[in-house]
From Swiss-Prot:
It comes from Porphyra purpurea (Red seaweed). GO terms for molecular function: electron transporter, transferring electrons within cytochrome b6/f complex of photosystem II activity. Its main location: plastid. It is a single-pass membrane protein. The gene is petN. GO terms for biological process: cytochrome complex assembly; photosynthesis. This is Cytochrome b6-f complex subunit 8. One of its GO terms (cellular component) is chloroplast thylakoid membrane.
């Protein structure tokens, strides 16, 4: 795995995590 793929995977993980935080926040979690 090269650095570009690793960086892209990390970016996608952070994006998904931030969306999960927003959803949980709106649900009162």
């Amino acid at each position: 795995m090269d650095i570009l793929s690793l960086g892209w995977a990390a970016l996608m993980a952070m994006f998904t995590f931030s969306i999960a935080m927003v959803v949980w926040g709106r649900n009162g979690f």
